[in-house]
């Protein structure tokens, strides 16, 4: 079983599922004209229906947690956009564990909401690269170190001047 786990940007998908099936799907993708296939070193079939047991465990934990109303839009990658009336935070977080990540749609939704700057915090610059491939008008900053934070602060001060 193989599913698309991530729709990262116009030029990149991530598949996940049973290891042998994912390997075979990668071979078939190359035969069909994919430019490259990069096996990811991950510990599970994240963002697929194979994660349903984890989603159920998460749902059980959420039964004892009170969630309030959101005071600003919150976007969920499992739907590629903001939470809507009738949807609940626990429901969407459970979905996020066991369904595809629609990052490209989420980036486009942010652009549609007027977002013009995104700060990526953590190791690597992959998310910033996906933003640049999806919405060229959005500025990105990748922050990994204290020095990066200082550079970000200076850059943002310069934009406000």
What residue ranges belong to the model's regions?
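Acyltransferase
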Residues: 1-136, 140-142, 147-150, 154-159
């Amino acid at each position: 079983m193989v599913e698309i786990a991530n729709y990262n940007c116009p030029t990149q998908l991530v598949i996940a599922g049973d290891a042998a099936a994912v390997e075979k799907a990668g071979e078939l993708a190359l035969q069909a004209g994919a430019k490259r296939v990069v096996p990811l070193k991950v510990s599970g079939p994240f963002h697929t229906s194979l994660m349903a047991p984890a989603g159920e465990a998460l749902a059980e934990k959420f039964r004892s947690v009170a969630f309030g109303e959101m005071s600003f839009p919150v976007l969920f990658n499992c739907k590629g956009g903001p939470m809507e009336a009738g949807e609940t935070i626990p429901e969407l977080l459970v979905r996020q564990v066991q369904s595809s990540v629609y990052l490209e749609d989420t980036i486009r939704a942010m652009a549609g909401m007027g977002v013009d700057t995104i700060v990526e915090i953590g190791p690597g610059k992959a998310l910033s690269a996906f933003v640049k491939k999806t919405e060229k008008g959005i500025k990105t900053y990748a922050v990994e170190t204290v020095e990066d934070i200082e550079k970000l602060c200076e850059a943002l001060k310069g934009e406000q001047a």
